[in-house]
Amino acid sequence: MAFQVNTNINAMNAHVQSALTQNALKTSLERLSSGLRINKAADDASGMTVADSLRSQASSLGQAIANTNDGMGIIQVADKAMDEQLKILDTVKVKATQAAQDGQTTESRKAIQSDIVRLIQGLDNIGNTTTYNGQALLSGQFTNKEFQVGAYSNQSIKASIGSTTSDKIGQVRIATGALITASGDISLTFKQVDGVNDVTLESVKVSSSAGTGIGVLAEVINKNSNRTGVKAYASVITTSDVAVQSGSLSNLTLNGIHLGNIADIKKNDSDGRLVAAINAVTSETGVEAYTDQKGRLNLRSIDGRGIEIKTDSVSNGPSALTMVNGGQDLTKGSTNYGRLSLTRLDAKSINVVSASDSQHLGFTAIGFGESQVAETTVNLRDVTGNFNANVKSASGANYNAVIASGNQSLGSGVTTLRGAMVVIDIAESAMKMLDKVRSDLGSVQNQMISTVNNISITQVNVKAAESQIRDVDFAEESANFNKNNILAQSGSYAMSQANTVQQNILRLLT
């Protein structure tokens, strides 16, 4: 080994190693003081990239959780508001049911109608004033809204809230045909009740015999309403064209039961002789009689069977009755199998065909002419005003005529019996619509809850993954620090010894 003075290789080596140790010691102190393994890109370039990506993902997930909670807050505000609206609709239905019985007077029905109008106004007020951050929720404007629920773009949940004001809910499709005057068997098929499938009902015989008639058909339709979505109402009423006149009836026959001659009938049947004679055989004919305020004779089927009535010409005086049902001559016989009203609790058309006529839809298939059907759609807002002639006709309130001209107005809301029945259906339809909206929102809220649960766990796992990369292992780094600290001390000693060794060369000069 050569002895050199100008270059102290040992000292240089000791210095280099001490410098490396100082750098390692500096890194250890930086990590221990910051708690991070990666304090700069040079510490772990690829690890820093992954850690920064994970940190960004975790931060975005935190905001996504906040977004989802905001969305659930919006849904809860709307849900509670609709809950109040449903309570209002339930009250409307109860009051309409209260009005749907003839123990009510016109004045009491008007009082009930006033209550209903106020309730609907309250419902509209809720629909128009329920807001979140200035956005109306129940007016129909809150549609196709998105809530970002992920760390990356287009990871969103969409939500829409339909309008719940009275002009947008409670749609009811009602249709009524003219008098059925032909007997026979009717087998109905409701087309595409769920958009795809048809429902065929059992065959019903329409006649004037017991256990048959349009009333039985209505019962068959109603017991299948859960499958078809359609309810039926049958009305079999024969009405004289004019008031009962003073006179007699000859050889009166009603639904095959011979009542014979009825003499000395007074005008408007003021002494009830004609009505009493007919009602005496109600158990056999299935028909009850009464006179209305105009003095006209009304025959009503109590079980929905048809009404067949015939008299002979009176030879020795005036006849008390000559025409019924808008021009049917009693001497030629009057046949009335009634009117059928169908109601669907939405705005969709009622598509029905019969086995005998599968080419026509609707009432034409049952035996009505093309122009012998009144149809219309009403909604909850219509309850607050007067029902127009179209509603009167389509609801069957005018009894024997398809069009309501010449009949008294149906009035407003529940101020008439038939109007109250219509309001019951409207309220039920409105409740179903609100329940559907609430159900959809409930599904969205459940989706949001599941999303929050998932991304909360994901956020924790992402932070854990970032921590594995970015955070320092204190046990490991403490060991490194202690090692480097000892090396630093030994390095200082080594440098001093290297200088001492170099001084030994001076002894050669002595």
Swiss-Prot record:
GO terms for cellular component: bacterial-type flagellum; extracellular region. It is found in: Secreted; Bacterial flagellum. Coiled coil: none annotated. Keywords: Bacterial flagellum, Secreted, Virulence. Changing residue 15 to G: In strain: Isolate 5294. It comes from the Bacteria. Flagellin is the subunit protein which polymerizes to form the filaments of bacterial flagella. Important for motility and virulence. Heteromer of FlaA and FlaB. FlaB is located proximal to the hook while the remainder of the filament is composed of the predominant FlaA. This is Flagellin A. It comes from Helicobacter pylori (strain ATCC 700392 / 26695). The gene is flaA.
